[in-house]
């Protein structure tokens, strides 16, 4: 059975750490996502894998299909960086006014 190799970078860390994973091409990509999340110590259930161009990858396919469609260099991002609840809450709302 052939293997595919992915270089997965954690984009939420300013140091941009990465892991290189080699898996059988028939591996469900959900397993790749889960393993990568565990390696980076981020929650798998609320993480996403995207391409370097920012395109989200549907994990309901095999690792071989992902490799053929998107290549070997991918990024993992925790949901708090992907538009989950709480995004933008650190910014003042437009209704608050500042006096100068």
From Swiss-Prot:
Localization in the cell: Nucleus; Cytoplasm
Segments of this protein annotated with the region Disordered: 78-100
Covalent link Glycyl lysine isopeptide (Gly-Lys) (interchain with K-? in acceptor proteins), residues: 83
PTM annotation: UFM1 precursor is cleaved by UFSP1, promoting its maturation: processing of the C-terminal Ser-Cys dipeptide is required to expose its C-terminal conserved Gly residue.
Cellular-component GO terms for this entry: cytoplasm; nucleus
Propeptide residue interval(s): 84-100
Cleavable signal peptide: none
Cited CDD domains: Ubl_UFM1
Sorted UniProt keywords: Cytoplasm, Isopeptide bond, Nucleus, Ubl conjugation, Ubl conjugation pathway
One matching Pfam family: Ufm1
GO biological process, one term: protein K69-linked ufmylation
Covalent link (Glycyl lysine isopeptide (Lys-Gly) (interchain with G-Cter in UFM1)) residue numbers: 69
Main subcellular location: nucleus
PANTHER family xrefs: UBIQUITIN-FOLD MODIFIER 1
Family in the record: Belongs to the UFM1 family.
Protein function: Ubiquitin-like modifier which can be covalently attached via an isopeptide bond to lysine residues of substrate proteins as a monomer or a lysine-linked polymer. The so-called ufmylation, requires the ufm1-activating E1 enzyme uba5, the ufm1-conjugating E2 enzyme ufc1, and the ufm1-ligase E3 enzyme ufl1. Ufmylation is involved in various processes, such as ribosome recycling, response to DNA damage, transcription or reticulophagy (also called ER-phagy) induced in response to endoplasmic reticulum stress.
Assembly information from the UniProt record: Interacts with uba5. Interacts with ufc1.
Record protein name field: Ubiquitin-fold modifier 1
Source organism (scientific name): Salmo salar (Atlantic salmon)
Highest classification ranks of the organism: Eukaryota, Metazoa, Chordata, Craniata, Vertebrata
